[in-house]
Amino acid sequence: MSRMVQCVKLGHEAEGLDRPPYPGALGARIYQEVSKEAWQGWLKHQTMLINEYRLSPIDPKSRTFLEKQMEAYFFGDGAQSPEGYVPPAPQDS
């Protein structure tokens, strides 16, 4: 049976993550309060941030920026989008 959490991002109970997705206290908090669905939303947002800002996940400044954005995405007022960012149009299957 799946572990259920009261997801802070979605605002309802949903399937929880299998393990903490990030080290430290932030990872533990995400594990306790964020659903798999919301985590997938973060991964898409993080990919957009990395691409638009040309971040390197191995650069300490980039990692600090992404960590702050992750915390804001789940527990704050929401993560930022790059100025002028327009999401790609949905593709027809």
UniProtKB/Swiss-Prot annotation:
<dbReference type="InterPro" id="IPR007457">
    <property type="entry name" value="Fe_traffick_prot_YggX"/>
</dbReference>
<dbReference type="InterPro" id="IPR036766">
    <property type="entry name" value="Fe_traffick_prot_YggX_sf"/>
</dbReference>
<dbReference type="GO" id="GO:0005829">
    <property type="term" value="C:cytosol"/>
</dbReference>
<protein>
    <recommendedName>
        <fullName>Probable Fe(2+)-trafficking protein</fullName>
    </recommendedName>
</protein>
<dbReference type="GO" id="GO:0034599">
    <property type="term" value="P:cellular response to oxidative stress"/>
</dbReference>
<keyword id="KW-0408">Iron</keyword>
<comment type="function">
    <text>Could be a mediator in iron transactions between iron acquisition and iron-requiring processes, such as synthesis and/or repair of Fe-S clusters in biosynthetic enzymes.</text>
</comment>
<dbReference type="GO" id="GO:0005506">
    <property type="term" value="F:iron ion binding"/>
</dbReference>
<comment type="similarity">
    <text>Belongs to the Fe(2+)-trafficking protein family.</text>
</comment>
<dbReference type="Pfam" id="PF04362">
    <property type="entry name" value="Iron_traffic"/>
</dbReference>
